[in-house]
């Protein structure tokens, strides 16, 4: 049951979900929305987690009025709280290994290893949250982007695979135009009308190694 007495009860349970407004404008209706670059951010408080899913309270203008807070306060608090959901970065190979060995995701988290990957073995990486829900929002955090840059050893592309995760690919050796076509093809093949709400975007992002710049990649 979603119960709370005040904003203070929600403050440390906030998290962010991101969408592409060109893809999912209908899912933004009636919500509090902040636009950053190509993404639209909506806000929720996760009051409980179960095997059936999350108990999310979505922030609407009516809820904001009832709580007596403004969007600047909500956004600031949500950016802080969002990191409480444990950012996870891993390779596909490591993920398969955990499935066979029944290991938790945190055991393969590259953020915990403090290593830089070798240029000759740089794979595609996945960025998500510990519960693998609404994990694409992790790319909004400059501190996370900088850690990724340190791990891959350079600038990188962000493939917006779904609202639950994004894929990370080193810039060297790839072209943004090819990656955009890849994302569009994957979206059209993997998503049906039933799960189309999980689509994030086909707009590949480029990020500087230091995490300072995140923008739409230029199609060479």
Predicted regions and their residues:
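Extended, low-hydrophobicity segments enriched in charged/polar residues
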Residues: 1-118
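Conserved catalytic core of nucleic-acid polymerases
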Residues: 110-133
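C-terminal structured domains
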Residues: 128-220
